[in-house]
Amino acid sequence: FKDGKITLVANAQQIKLAKDAYNTTIDATGKHVYPGFIVPNSTLGLVEIDAVKSSDDEEEIGTFNPNVRSIVAYTADSKVIETVRPNGILMAQITPRGGRVSGSSSIVQLDAWHWKEALIKENDGIHINLPATFRRGGWWAEPGSIEPNKEYNKQLQEINAFFKSSKAYLGGTSDSRNLVTEATKGLFDGTQTLFIHADEEKQIVDGIQLALENGIKKIVIVGGFEAYKAAPLLLKNNIGVLLRRIHDLPTNEDQDIDLPYKMAKILTDKGILVGLENSGSKERMSSRNLPFLAGTCVAYGLDKEKALQLITLNTAKLLGIDQQCGSLEEGKDATLFIS
């Protein structure tokens, strides 16, 4: 590669290069060359120390915050980032948290001193969090019973009303500016993706229908534990899934204990584009475990090459950066490593 771009991908046994063709030659005999792994839906660089409030920038106050841009709060020289790169994590989608509409994420490469030089794709999508259909009472030491969320339909309609009002504003001729609704423009003109954070089947179906009714075409499900139940709808609308952390327990007591480990293969076999994400407890430091999540998918039946794509090319496609990275191809960024 030269100037950060891959210039040649070929079989070394079939071609011969001049010794001075490249400034540096690396002997990788017996090793593998991998495209950089991508961790989506990440808060890397947004929080340094959980107990120090001044270093926590992952969440903004308010319910509808599409105008919140995570990239301006991203700390490129975070000490946590230094611990994930040795495991091949070279890119991340920096994603805000909280509210119904959390804000806009951006995609960065992790070898930088400032967010501007780290940028791969700015404001790639807007993230919404759908309300749960069921809730458990009590607290962690004394869990209560599971009960239906009586406010579910009302909360869903609030999201729907927000998008309808945003669309109306963008199509109007008002002289007054509304920065909150202006921030949703990319969803309606196709330049941004709507990332719907949902695990339950009803959440997923309702979220997709809500988006389609408002003219939003580029959709990705984040979490998607029960996405396999909505596979026909996902396939019909070309919607992929950033699958929740698979090193976890099932969400329901009557589910197969190994279901989280099998989920990537189940969705892949159904023809759904799947990537892996790692949000949850200790998500920033445990981002380094992303390749092990892919390894678990292999142990539960997925082909090794397809498992690798879960954290490289598939994720790049879901984030809209596959023309730039995600695989080893001529013309793409030389964001890679040898192991």
What are these regions (language model features)?
Residues 1-34:
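Histidine-rich, glycine-flanked metal-binding segment
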Residues 18, 36-37, 119, 230-232, ...:
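Short, charged, surface-exposed secondary-structure boundary motifs
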Residues 28-87, 92-95:
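Metal-associated gating/positioning segment near the N- to mid-region
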Residues 50, 55-61, 67, 193, ...:
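His/Asp/Glu-enriched, well-ordered alpha-helical/loop segment
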Residues 87-218:
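Polyanionic/metal-chelating signatures
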Residues 195-199, 218-226, 246, 250-251:
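Catalytic beta/alpha-barrel core
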Residues 211-218, 235-242, 271-273:
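Glycine-enriched alpha-helix->loop->beta-strand junction motifs that scaffold or abut catalytic
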Residues 226-236:
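Active-site-adjacent beta->alpha loops and helix N-cap segments on the catalytic face
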